[in-house]
Amino acid sequence: ELKKTGLYENAIIWSPSKADLSDLSISHCLSYIKKIKYGLLSYKEERRLGLSWSKRLSERSFLAVNGTLLTANLAIKSGVGCHLGGGTHHSHFDYGAGFCVFNDLAYSALMLTKNKIVKKILIFDCDVHQGDGTARILEKNDNIFTCSIHCKKNFPVNKAQSNLDVELDDHTNNIEYLHEIQKSIKFCVNSFKPDFVFYDAGIDIHKHDELGKLN
């Protein structure tokens, strides 16, 4: 699809390496990481994740998180970067959920601040579902601000507490949505003054997404 639009031809394509277990432990517990690496998930854990373990899933998961980190480092140098395999915001410290194995947003933000590449990071999450895993992993980190703009009556049922949560009613339209986006980004930037922004651009806000509930 990207080739059809012509965007692919104008892009510089990069390939990430796999994340190390030691690096991933900055955002996930080692026992869970090993379950993904070696296929040790229980049936109940696979049900919660929404995916059955396979070698390809494991390999992709270790690549995807580093894809976001690579993109972030490239964006710091060039001003912007795009990673199509990121945004896995339902993954928690010790388990995966909602088709999200590892939380690339939390992982990459923590790696950037740990290595002192940037000091303050804003995660601006516009997926139709709340970024509950991101919020919980980063809830005690004062250098990373989490903002989630999501449909109120949608997954997950039990919401987490982001630094800023904006809950949208069913059938929210373009004008209402853009108003909330503008108001929220202005508040986040003015109050937190981030050095770097992760933008999780979930496409499930589109009116043709059957489960999104927005217009």
What is the role of each PLM region?
Residues E1-L21:
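N-terminal low-complexity, Ser/Thr- and acidic-residue-enriched intrinsically disordered segments
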Residues E9-N10, S31, K119-K120:
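Residue-level detector of short coil/turn "hinge" positions at structural boundaries
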Residues W14, S25, H83:
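Short, conserved beta-strand segments within well-ordered enzyme catalytic domains
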Residues S17-L41:
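Charged, often glycine-rich, active-site loop that binds/positions anionic groups
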Residues I36, Y43-N215:
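A general "terminal functional-core" signal
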